[in-house]
């Protein structure tokens, strides 16, 4: 009987964006803020620089969101401002070389998840998205999602799919568009400090 003495090696699993502690989402405290009509990714989460850059080829097999529990009046405001229901999906991005402001190509995206049943929880969704070394795992929010912490240290930074001149005005933010057409390129001209998008993505090595 032929056999192999080599032990099977389990594939490496990495949780992108994971930190020892997770800040509380901003709602229902005041000011209550949520992200909306945008695709974004964390550039620095206070502990790690570029926490969502994929370190090796593999697949994203799961992702989490830490969601606030806004009050009824806060939910009504976000529904009116961004649309309803609250929802999110993963975005697999690749930076376009030489572009300034930075531009990113949407390579793949996950299924849209409705968040209403999970407000006030950390929820985990399954996924099966192929990624390559150097990709960035971002978060797309077609309407709104209260997965957002604010008033943090200045080394908490995230980047958003908006033009550089459309970073702060409420009308510009409301009329912003998430990146949802696979193969498209969009500028990520807005960088926000002292804030964090509260998501993680589980990467399993291999194809």
PLM segments and residue spans:
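Sec-dependent, cleavable N-terminal signal peptides
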Residues: 1-6
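Aromatic- and Gly/Pro-enriched, solvent-exposed loop/edge beta-strand patches characteristic
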Residues: 9-32, 82-174, 178
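A carbohydrate-recognition surface predominantly in extracellular/luminal proteins
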Residues: 26, 31-39, 50, 59-65
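Short beta-strands within extracellular/lumenal beta-sheet-rich domains
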Residues: 35-55, 120-123
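Extended extracellular/luminal ectodomain segments enriched in beta-structured repeat modules
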Residues: 53-73, 134
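A broad structural signal for short, well-ordered beta-strand segments within beta-sheet-rich domains
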Residues: 60-62, 106-109, 199
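Short consensus segments that form the blades of beta-propeller domains
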Residues: 74-84
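Compositionally biased low-complexity segments at domain edges in trafficked proteins
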Residues: 170-207
